[in-house]
C-alpha cells in the first residue's frame, strides 16, 4: 500500500497574495456589473464579458508564468488564483441562467449558457496563442 500524499504546509505569503488578488478581482467584477447593469429578462453581458475576458487573461498569464518568464513566486497565486479567480464568476453565471429561465427568456438562457462556455474556451485558446506568439514561446 502506498503512503497517502502529503499536503504541503500553507505559506502565509501565498495565502495573502491570493486574498489580495481575489479581493481586487471581485471588486473589479462588482464595479463592472454596477456600471453595466442587466435589465430583467436580458442577457447579462457584463458577466459574459468578464468571464470571457478573464479566460483570455488566464491563458496569457499561464503562458507567461510557465513558458516565457521567470516570475516571482507570488505572481501566479496573486494574479491567477486570486485576481482572475475573483474577477470571473461561475456562480453568478449559473444564477443568471436560472433568472433568465424563470423570467421566461428560455432562448436567451440557452444562448447564454452555451455562448459563455464556447466563448470562454475560445478566450483561453486565443489568450494562450497570443501570448505564445508575442513572446516567441511557441518557437522554443
From Swiss-Prot:
Task: Name the gene behind this protein.
Answer: fluC2
Q: What's this protein's function?
A: Fluoride-specific ion channel. Important for reducing fluoride concentration in the cell, thus reducing its toxicity.
| Compartments (UniProt record) | Cell membrane
State the UniProt keywords alphabetically: Cell membrane, Ion channel, Ion transport, Membrane, Metal-binding, Sodium, Transmembrane, Transmembrane helix, Transport
Q: How does it sit in the membrane?
A: Multi-pass membrane protein
The catalysed reaction is: fluoride(in) = fluoride(out)
Residues the entry annotates as binding Na(+): 85, 88
Name of protein:
Fluoride-specific ion channel FluC 2
Question: How does its activity get regulated?
Answer: Na(+) is not transported, but it plays an essential structural role and its presence is essential for fluoride channel function.
Query: What Pfam families would the database entry show?
Result: CRCB
Q: Cross-referenced HAMAP family, in alphabetical order?
A: FluC
Tell me the protein family, please: Belongs to the fluoride channel Fluc/FEX (TC 1.A.43) family.
NCBIfam families from the xrefs?
A: crcB
Coiled-coil region(s): none
Which PANTHER family does the entry mention?
FLUORIDE EXPORT PROTEIN 1-RELATED
Looking at the UniProt record for this protein, which Gene Ontology cellular component terms does it annotate, in alphabetical order? plasma membrane
GO terms in the biological process aspect are: cellular detoxification of fluoride
**Which species does the entry assign this protein to?**
Nocardia farcinica (strain IFM 10152)
Amino acid at each position: 500500500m502506498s503512503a497517502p500524499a502529503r499536503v504541503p504546509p500553507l505559506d502565509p505569503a501565498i495565502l495573502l497574495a491570493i486574498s489580495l488578488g481575489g479581493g481586487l478581482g471581485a471588486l473589479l467584477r462588482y464595479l463592472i456589473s454596477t456600471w453595466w447593469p442587466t435589465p430583467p429578462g436580458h442577457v447579462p453581458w457584463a458577466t459574459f464579458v468578464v468571464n470571457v475576458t478573464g479566460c483570455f487573461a488566464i491563458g496569457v498569464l499561464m503562458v507567461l508564468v510557465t513558458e516565457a518568464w521567470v516570475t516571482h513566486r507570488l505572481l501566479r497565486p496573486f494574479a491567477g488564483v486570486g485576481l482572475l479567480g475573483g474577477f470571473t464568476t461561475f456562480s453568478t453565471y449559473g444564477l443568471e441562467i436560472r433568472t433568465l429561465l424563470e423570467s421566461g427568456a428560455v432562448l436567451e438562457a440557452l444562448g447564454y449558457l452555451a455562448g459563455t462556455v464556447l466563448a470562454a474556451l475560445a478566450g483561453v485558446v486565443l489568450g494562450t496563442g497570443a501570448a505564445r506568439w508575442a513572446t516567441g514561446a511557441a518557437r522554443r
